[in-house]
Amino acid sequence: MAGMASDGTQYDPRQFDTKMNAILGEEGEETFYTNYDEVCDSFDAMELQPDLLRGIYAYGFEKPSAIQQRGIIPFCKGLDVIQQAQSGTGKTATFCSGVLQQLDISLVQCQALVLAPTRELAQQIEKVMRALGDYLGVKAQACVGGTSVREDQRVLQSGVHVVVGTPGRVFDLLRRQSLRADAIKMFVLDEADEMLSRGFKDQIYDIFQLLPSKVQVGVFSATMPPEALEITRKFMNKPVRILVKRDELTLEGIKQFYVNVDKEEWKLETLCDLYETLAITQSVIFVNTRRKVDWLTDKMRSRDHTVSATHGDMDQNTRDIIMREFRSGSSRVLITTDLLARGIDVQQVSLVINFDLPTQPENYLHRIGRSGRFGRKGVAINFMTSEDERMMADIQRFYNVVVEELPSNVADLL
């Protein structure tokens, strides 16, 4: 299982760096590649609206993270921005703050459109937007597939300031003119590497064509391959770039281990051996296909292990219920695909198991970022057969890390 780029070619980290340097046109010793120097080490110094500040502090933020110190102000100034930082470092609050600061609350029309690749992530962003904008009186709506179009139309008719959605539903609403684009002045892509991949790229272009010509564009992600950066040139105007160097793209505080499994079919036994440890804390188990989610869930339950599962073939209502139970702690072990790896914030997760290694090095970061969010400690365990050795080597080279063999005292690590 070799490391493959999204276009199917062999993954080469050195080529990644060469391309990245060519695109950014600069190299330096700083953690961040950036062409914008202003850094604010407190929210108070950012000259935000008092009611937005109240919302930020009420949400539990005290001091801005590194990406927030650099990223909020240029967005608030109306500049196009490309921002990349690790999972769990506050990118969502960065662009939500930038959007909320610029809204004219007295004008109840859609002024900001935020797109995300999955329904769950879009709904989560909407919750953050509402929470931070609570004292401003912001009206936000999540428009995603798998929910009632009529309900979206009803809410949009009554007036909202911000729409957060998935590309398919948003394009449909724009086409029907249920969502009017006239007043939209901000356009944000979250998890932009995924949004600019082949699956979504055409839809993003179609949506962009329907927006006012002077719309501000913000592009955010935990990973930003050079291919995605090149695409952004087509619809961005001299963007402020804040990108973390690849060597910094490991997740501090997350201990990473592998378990050698001689045969694929023995992974199940290994997982069952670890189950008691899993249930001590909240754990997420990643596999590579929806079918395998169902298979592994059935196998675990047949052995009287309590697990829950979610993937893209389930209807939205079922997925919502499962995620609510997991967030509340009433379910402790969740089996899923990369669907969940994209930015879903479950604060209590401290253990991630890659039952299957991801098919691309970048997705490793998205997955293990479920544990140790906002600087907490976490553990990632990778099941590895002989076929996975190439990918594990690619991952270690890509993030400049050493993944060690799992010690016997795994419970002590949690």
From Swiss-Prot:
Entry EC no(s): 3.6.4.13
Job description of the protein: ATP-dependent RNA helicase which is a subunit of the eIF4F complex involved in cap recognition and is required for mRNA binding to ribosome. In the current model of translation initiation, eIF4A unwinds RNA secondary structures in the 5'-UTR of mRNAs which is necessary to allow efficient binding of the small ribosomal subunit, and subsequent scanning for the initiator codon.
Entry-linked PANTHER family: ATP-DEPENDENT RNA HELICASE DBP3
One Gene Ontology MF term: translation initiation factor activity
Places the protein is found: Cytoplasm
Key words of the record: Acetylation, ATP-binding, Cytoplasm, Helicase, Hydrolase, Initiation factor, Nucleotide-binding, Phosphoprotein, Protein biosynthesis, RNA-binding
Pfam families in UniProt: DEAD, Helicase_C
Claim: Membrane is one of the keywords in the record: no
Name this polypeptide is given: Eukaryotic initiation factor 4A-3
Gene Ontology CC: mitochondrion; plant-type cell wall; plant-type vacuole
InterPro entries tied to this protein: DEAD/DEAH_box_helicase_dom, Helicase_ATP-bd, Helicase_C-like, P-loop_NTPase, RNA-helicase_DEAD-box_CS, RNA_helicase_DEAD_Q_motif
Phosphoserine PTM positions: 106
Organism of origin: Arabidopsis thaliana
Binding site for ATP: 85-92
Modified residues (N-acetylalanine): 2
Gene of this entry: TIF4A-3
Sequence positions bearing Phosphothreonine: 147
Boundaries of every Helicase ATP-binding domain copy: 72-242
Subunit structure: eIF4F is a multi-subunit complex, the composition of which varies with external and internal environmental conditions. It is composed of at least EIF4A, EIF4E and EIF4G.
Free-text comment about domains: The Q motif is unique to and characteristic of the DEAD box family of RNA helicases and controls ATP binding and hydrolysis.
